[in-house]
Regions:
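Active-site gating loops and adjacent loop-to-helix segments of metal-dependent hydrolytic enzymes
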Residues: 113-126
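Short glycine-enriched loops at secondary-structure junctions
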Residues: 105-110
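Conserved anion-binding
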Residues: 98, 111-113
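N-terminal pre-domain/capping segments
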Residues: 1-101, 123-130
Length: 131
């Protein structure tokens, strides 16, 4: 029988897109409550330590490991070389954390995090060339 591990995203405690939501929840509270709830894996959140040694120590104390992390690519709005450099650095961080997965989404021209832009009326559309 396969062993299943259960993980959760820290967005249940803090919201990286809307930082006012959950800003009172510290990293330590977030991962402690994850562990108390029985989770053994999690995504990386914006409030997490950026140093793999520091992050690993805090997570190992609670029996949690990093399962993945979100990567926002901006291929539509930034030079490819910059996006590639950022992606490689992100993957190296994940590898140092023992993660095997990376969640990737194109965010160039996204309305995400732009609270003054209507989701439907203000959404951009890609040109044929961008597709």
């Amino acid at each position: 029988m396969a062993k299943i591990k259960l993980g959760i995203a820290p967005i249940a405690w803090t919201n990286d897109d809307m930082p006012d939501l959950g800003k009172e929840n510290t990293f330590e509270q977030c991962v402690s409550e994850m562990a108390l709830a029985g989770f053994t894996g999690c995504e990386v959140g914006g409030s997490y330590p950026k140093d793999p040694v520091v992050l690993k120590k805090a997570l190992e104390l609670r029996g949690i490991s990093i399962a993945s992390a979100w990567f926002s690519s901006f291929l539509l709005t930034q030079p490819y070389e910059q996006v590639e450099k950022d992606f490689i650095a992100h993957c190296e961080f994940l590898k140092a954390m023992g993660a095997e997965f990376c969640n990737v989404a194109e965010q160039g021209n996204s309305v995400q995090g732009k609270l003054d832009v209507p989701v439907f009326a203000g959404k951009p559309t890609n040109t044929e060339e961008q597709w």
